[in-house]
């Protein structure tokens, strides 16, 4: 049984994990999905739905270039920053979160993305970049 509230589907933890993994496959990458956990007292936690990508992290520690998609992590941070801005009345912090999200999405729309997304694009081939290069591209848009 589930309840719908706005555009959310509220589930028990395990069922929610399974359902969210299934839904994410329809969009091509679990790395594009965040999770927001809200306690009855209003405490809120934002996280990347995919958890950690230890295989890529260990490669990175060995000096190898990786193409891990950081979008879910970025959006977990922006969600938390926006919430903190709302709670503390810091409009500039919430605005920064919005600007970072827009810069991230605009980078992908411009055809610069990590390998997992580049493989899903039909038509002209996008530029598949490393995680670090993707973050640099987002930063360049953010600072423009």
Segments predicted by a language model, with ranges:
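Proline-rich intrinsically disordered, low-complexity coils
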Residues: 1, 40, 70, 124-126
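Single conserved hydrophobic/aromatic residue that forms the stacking wall/gate
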Residues: 1-9
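Glycine-rich phosphate/nucleotide-binding loop
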Residues: 11-99, 106-107
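Internal helix-turn-beta structural module
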Residues: 62-68, 83-144
């Amino acid at each position: 049984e589930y309840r719908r509230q706005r555009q959310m589907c509220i589930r028990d933890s395990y069922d929610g994990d399974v359902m969210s993994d299934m839904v994410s496959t329809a969009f091509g990458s679990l790395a594009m999905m965040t999770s927001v956990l809200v306690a009855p007292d209003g405490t809120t936690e934002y996280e990347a739905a995919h958890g950690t990508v230890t295989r890529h992290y260990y490669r990175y520690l060995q000096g190898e270039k990786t193409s891990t998609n950081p979008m879910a992590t970025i959006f977990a941070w922006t969600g938390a920053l926006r919430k903190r801005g709302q709670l503390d009345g810091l409009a500039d912090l919430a605005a920064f979160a919005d600007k970072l999200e827009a810069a991230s999405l605009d980078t992908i729309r411009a055809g610069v993305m990590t390998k997992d997304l580049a493989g899903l694009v039909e038509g002209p081939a996008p530029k598949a970049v490393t995680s670090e290069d993707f973050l640099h591209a987002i930063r360049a848009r953010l600072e423009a």
